[in-house]
């Protein structure tokens, strides 16, 4: 590995350990020429994943787009950034585990909503209203009613 300070080609590995929940290897290295210590990360290169949009266009999977949508939907809500990043991680892992080269925005949106409804119902409704593009109030009200029914069925008082 080339030293970032003196550009010498040889360095030795001082320490190696797993990073990023086992998805990467972190290595501490020392340059054999100038003794400068630096860190490198080794990751598996994921095959490009294409997203098929509703209009048929294809573009590369973009975690940041999902995160931006979550941030907008959770604005002024008690949802931590770490929780939103975890949703994005979950969605990406689920999509990549399918083993497909292409995935629809419909499936990605459903995965996001499955995680978001359990985190914050208001953020879920905001996300769903943009994602599902409700055509009229009755569809929107049905979505709200589904959340209310789910909340009632999962509350401790509903076991009586």
Curated annotation (Swiss-Prot):
ZnF locations on chain (unnamed): 3-34
ATP-cone domain location: 49-139
One function term, GO molecular function aspect: zinc ion binding
Keywords on record: ATP-binding, DNA-binding, Metal-binding, Nucleotide-binding, Repressor, Transcription, Transcription regulation, Zinc, Zinc-finger
PROSITE patterns per the UniProt record, alphabetical: ATP_CONE (PS51161)
Family according to the record: Belongs to the NrdR family.
Name assigned to this protein: Transcriptional repressor NrdR
Cofactor(s) needed: Zn(2+)
Superkingdom, natural source: Bacteria
